[in-house]
From Swiss-Prot:
Cited PROSITE patterns: ATPASE_ALPHA_BETA
EC number, UniProt record: 7.1.2.2
Keywords, ordered alphabetically: ATP synthesis, ATP-binding, Cell membrane, CF(1), Hydrogen ion transport, Ion transport, Membrane, Nucleotide-binding, Translocase, Transport
Catalyzed reactions per annotation: ATP + H2O + 4 H(+)(in) = ADP + phosphate + 5 H(+)(out)
Cited CDD domains: ATP-synt_F1_alpha_C, ATP-synt_F1_alpha_N, F1-ATPase_alpha_CD
Annotated positions binding ATP: 169-176
Subunit organization: F-type ATPases have 2 components, CF(1) - the catalytic core - and CF(0) - the membrane proton channel. CF(1) has five subunits: alpha(3), beta(3), gamma(1), delta(1), epsilon(1). CF(0) has three main subunits: a(1), b(2) and c(9-12). The alpha and beta chains form an alternating ring which encloses part of the gamma chain. CF(1) is attached to CF(0) by a central stalk formed by the gamma and epsilon chains, while a peripheral stalk is formed by the delta and b chains.
Protein name in UniProt: ATP synthase subunit alpha
Length: 501
């Protein structure tokens, strides 16, 4: 082997000429204590609140407690390999998530990393998960309807775009079912949906995703999932991440629906973090700022004014109660933050009234302005009839002789309750809801046996679609029942009743 000194010399010269001194300065600290997903780090003097910190092995943490001599940090991933004395690096950025069209149809974790095995999410746009809610000037009052496709809700507890409507009830009362039905009903509208699953079983989330796929709803939906097996910090971050993804679309002038399922588990995760970080506990051991935890999230739902693009973000937070106790700490907090609540009762659920909406306790504080006029016309008497029915039903149990007017009200009420029942995953277009409720409140169902009410409704709507499609079309486009339209609808119902046996 021949050594050529001149060649070696030229290579060394070249290397020296190309050599660039690169000094990378990064602020580092040392782990002084770690355990239970929490690390205390010494030496990060310039650390920001909510800043991402990098632990050995690429695991990220988030600075939550900035104390005099150390930083209390929650670890967003596996922490068993982290030990005392490890070096922690500052990243200089706060927690942010990828946003944009690339996320639609995907299942991601609260950091925006894909969970569905469909490859990486290609987007160059990121948003911080926390941000200040839109101010008074940038907002507009809620005035457009967001149809859920559920008769009991669209008629009596209407939801508008930009509203925050709480869904509250015990476990197994159909809270998630209402949210999923609402998402399915946004098909063929311009609404982008985001379903945030917080602390649920992975199998439950998989089932929800499959249901959405089966109904073609994943084409306009993003699922953000922090399952029960994920670390508490991810459960805490999930709603904010979902909201940040929605805000990107809202600021482009689009309409977004975000479901937080459920915020009770987020509050429990935050309580866990706060206690581990040694923050002082308050009522029910929740930290003092648990109200702010939910208020700063739900205040980000808004209807933007036309100068800001006119987009909207509607929030449907879900809260699980224990044995119907709506006066517990978290339920009362969220009730006071939202613009109304849909209260689901287990007694109604077990009695076969599904969706199990308690119409007396449920309310929508702003949705009335968003309801279409035709629905307002038929639903006004519906609420009254049901209220009178509930009052009289209590007396009727005593079995005393009842006069004709009372009997008529009881008869009408029974049929209205029956009409408001609805199968899961079968949301109904608003014009069909109007026609069905119109028939009920005008007494066309009073002479039918209760068990015939649902078959009557199904056959009647089929008859209307086949023979009088223009009536439904007119209700949908004009949104009002004129005298002429009312008389046409009445004659159509009478014509159908003759054929219905």
């Amino acid at each position: 082997m021949n050594l050529r000194p001149e060649e070696i010399g030229s290579i060394i010269k070249q290397q020296i000429e190309n050599y660039q001194v690169q000094v990378e300065v990064s602020s580092v600290g040392t782990v002084i204590q770690v355990g239970d997903g929490i690390a205390r780090v010494y030496g990060l003097e310039d650390c920001m609140a909510s800043e991402l910190l990098e632990f050995p092995g690429g695991v990220l943490g988030m600075a939550l407690n900035l104390e005099e001599d150390n930083v209390g940090c929650v670890i967003l991933g596996p922490y068993t390999h982290i030990k005392e004395g490890d070096t922690v690096k500052r990243t200089g950025r706060v927690v942010s998530v990828p946003v944009g069209e690339a996320l639609i149809g995907r299942v991601v974790n609260p950091l925006g990393q894909p969970l569905d095995g469909k490859g990486p999410i290609v987007t160059d746009k990121f948003r911080p998960v926390e941000r200040i809610a839109p101010g008074v000037i940038t907002r507009k009052s809620v005035h457009e309807p967001l149809q859920t496709g559920i008769k009991a809700i669209d008629s009596m507890i209407p939801i508008g775009r930009g509203q925050r409507e709480l869904i509250i009830g015990d476990r197994q009362t159909g809270k998630t079912a209402i949210a999923i039905d609402t998402i399915i009903n946004q098909k063929n509208t311009d609404v982008i949906c985001i379903y945030v699953a917080i602390g649920q079983k992975a199998s439950t989330v998989a089932k929800v995703v499959q249901t959405l796929k089966d109904h073609g709803a994943m084409d306009y939906t993003i699922v953000v999932s922090a399952t029960a097996s994920d670390p508490a910090p991810l459960l805490y971050l999930a709603p904010y991440a979902g909201c940040a993804m929605g805000e990107e679309f809202m600021e482009q002038g689009k309409h977004v629906l975000v479901v937080y399922d459920d915020l009770s588990k987020q509050a429990a995760a935050y309580r866990e973090l706060s206690l581990l970080l040694r923050r002082p506990p308050g009522r029910e051991a929740y930290p003092g700022d648990v109200f702010y935890l939910h208020s700063r999230l739900l205040e980000r739902a808004a209807k933007l004014s036309d100068e800001y693009g006119g987009g909207s973000l509607t929030a449907l937070p879900i809260i699980e109660t224990q044995a119907g106790d709506v006066s517990a700490y978290i339920p009362t907090n969220v009730i006071s933050i939202t613009d109304g609540q849909i209260y689901l009762e287990s007694d109604l659920f077990y009695a076969g009234v599904r969706p199990a909406v308690n119409v007396g306790l449920s309310v929508s504080r702003v949705g009335g302005a968003a309801q279409i006029k035709a629905m307002k016309q038929v639903a006004g008497s519906l609420r009254l009839d049901l209220a009178q029915y509930r009052e009289l039903a209590a007396f009727a149990q005593f079995g005393s002789d009842l006069d004709k007017a009372t009997l008529a009200r009881l008869t009408r009420g029974e049929r209205l309750v029956e009409l408001l029942k609805q199968d899961q995953y079968k949301p109904m277009p608003v014009e069909e809801q109007v026609m069905a409720i119109f028939a009920a409140v005008n007494g066309y169902l009073d002479d039918l046996p209760v068990e015939k009410v649902r078959p009557f409704e199904a056959e009647f709507l089929k008859f209307m679609r086949a023979n009088y499609p223009q009536i439904g079309e007119e209700i949908r486009t004009k949104g009002v029942l004129t005298d002429e339209l009312t008389s046409r609808l009445k004659s159509a119902i009478e014509e159908f009743k003759k054929t219905f046996a």
